[in-house]
């Protein structure tokens, strides 16, 4: 009898993606984050769906509706805590997934990498509009500060900002459209993730050594299905520990106060996963310059494949590049810390130095290290 999973039009796609897919035999736990991101996306869509049943996107009732979800809806507090902290887990997995791609040279699969960068931007947009929805103080002022950056665009800036707001300031129209965006974007993310997977399966996975693994492949199931299941169990455990024991530890206390346009919080800052970009934005005294640096901090990922100078794909056997990679990691942690600090010395100068180092590492030092490693590997006799 012919196996149904190999002949049925729909089952065949699933089979070729998750069952009979030939996978390198040596991929480490750093390759788990793709499936974990998929799990995060499903968790966020499901919890978000149940939250949307009870949420009202009106400035007068949004804050109260979130309180109602937590107080009166069956397990509403749990659904909301999983959704809020699920976003943090999502970004944690995203950053590790991108870091893995940079370390092991996965960015040389250019189409997969570029779709990945577009996915990152889309997830960031989704998280931003989602943070505005509870209509607390930090929701309102975060939306005001970030959307105001559009006004830095020459000539059309003010018109563009007012068009996004749907008025002359962040108000009811803004909240309503942000809810609409927050509802539709996860489905766009799902579609992009499938395209991401499509391009990945054109080439097959990279592996820690960076060498072509075609000579040694194993089936995805059962080896990597069980490995992914373990990863998902640990992810779920961490998410539940966070959501049940300290659900508000990553949030801002200001967001427990309803939005008030007449009272500005002393320190306006986004969620932790945006702080590195926020620090780069603030490190430039000029408004337009800051916006351009903010965009560049993410879009620089698109040119990483063009800056690959080394003869070896992976950093596994390149100690100088490894050192620079971990300096970049430490630098991003420093930027995240600075983004959460007030705008005063010594934080200003630390932020400016860290911002310069961020671009210097990616655009100059890492390509130079690749060239130097090539030179060192050449026989000298």
UniProtKB/Swiss-Prot annotation:
Annotated binding of a ubiquinone, by residue: 201
Main localization (coarse): mitochondrion
Record keyword Iron present: yes
Cofactor(s) the protein needs: heme b
Domain of life, per lineage: Eukaryota
Cofactor note: Binds 2 heme b groups non-covalently.
Membrane topology value: Multi-pass membrane protein
More about this protein: Heme 1 (or BL or b562) is low-potential and absorbs at about 562 nm, and heme 2 (or BH or b566) is high-potential and absorbs at about 566 nm.
Complex formation: The cytochrome bc1 complex contains 11 subunits: 3 respiratory subunits (MT-CYB, CYC1 and UQCRFS1), 2 core proteins (UQCRC1 and UQCRC2) and 6 low-molecular weight proteins (UQCRH/QCR6, UQCRB/QCR7, UQCRQ/QCR8, UQCR10/QCR9, UQCR11/QCR10 and a cleavage product of UQCRFS1). This cytochrome bc1 complex then forms a dimer.
Family listed: Belongs to the cytochrome b family.
Role description: Component of the ubiquinol-cytochrome c reductase complex (complex III or cytochrome b-c1 complex) that is part of the mitochondrial respiratory chain. The b-c1 complex mediates electron transfer from ubiquinol to cytochrome c. Contributes to the generation of a proton gradient across the mitochondrial membrane that is then used for ATP synthesis.
Name this polypeptide is given: Cytochrome b
Organism whose genome encodes this protein: Murexechinus melanurus (Black-tailed dasyure)
């Amino acid at each position: 009898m012919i196996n149904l999973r190999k002949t049925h039009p729909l089952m065949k796609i699933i089979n070729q993606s998750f069952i009979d897919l030939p996978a390198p035999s040596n991929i480490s736990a750093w390759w788990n984050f793709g499936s974990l991101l998929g799990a995060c996306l499903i968790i966020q869509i499901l919890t978000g769906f149940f939250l949307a049943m009870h949420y009202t996107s009106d400035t007068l009732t949004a804050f109260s509706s979130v309180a109602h979800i937590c107080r009166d809806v069956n397990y509403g507090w749990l659904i909301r805590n999983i959704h809020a902290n699920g976003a943090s887990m999502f970004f944690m997995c995203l950053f590790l997934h991108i870091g893995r791609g940079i370390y092991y040279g996965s960015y040389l699969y250019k189409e997969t990498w570029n779709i990945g960068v577009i996915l990152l931007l889309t997830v960031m947009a989704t998280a931003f509009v989602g943070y505005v929805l509870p209509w607390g103080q930090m929701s309102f002022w975060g939306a005001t500060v970030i959307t105001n950056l559009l006004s830095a665009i020459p000539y059309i800036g003010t018109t563009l900002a007012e068009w996004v707001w749907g008025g002359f300031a962040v108000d009811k129209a803004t909240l309503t459209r942000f809810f609409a965006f927050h509802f539709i974007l996860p489905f766009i993310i799902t579609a992009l993730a499938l395209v991401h997977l499509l391009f990945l399966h054109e080439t097959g996975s990279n592996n820690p050594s960076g060498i072509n693994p075609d000579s040694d492949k194993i089936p995805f199931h059962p080896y990597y299905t069980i490995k992914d299941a373990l990863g998902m169990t640990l992810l779920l455990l961490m998410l539940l520990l966070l959501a049940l024991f300290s659900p508000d530890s990553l949030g801002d206390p200001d967001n427990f106060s309803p939005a008030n346009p007449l009272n500005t919080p002393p320190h306006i800052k986004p969620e932790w996963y945006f702080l590195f970009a926020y620090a780069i934005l603030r490190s430039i005294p000029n408004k337009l310059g800051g916006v351009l640096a903010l965009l560049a901090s993410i879009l620089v990922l698109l040119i990483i494949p063009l800056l690959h100078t080394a003869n070896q794909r992976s950093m596994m056997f390149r100690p100088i590049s490894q050192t620079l990679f971990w300096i970049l990691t430490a630098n991003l942690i420093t930027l995240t810390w600075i983004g959460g600090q007030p705008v005063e010395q010594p934080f200003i100068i630390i932020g400016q130095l860290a911002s310069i180092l961020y671009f210097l590492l990616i655009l100059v030092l890492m390509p130079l290290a690749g060239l130097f490693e090539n030179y060192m590997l050449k026989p000298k006799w």
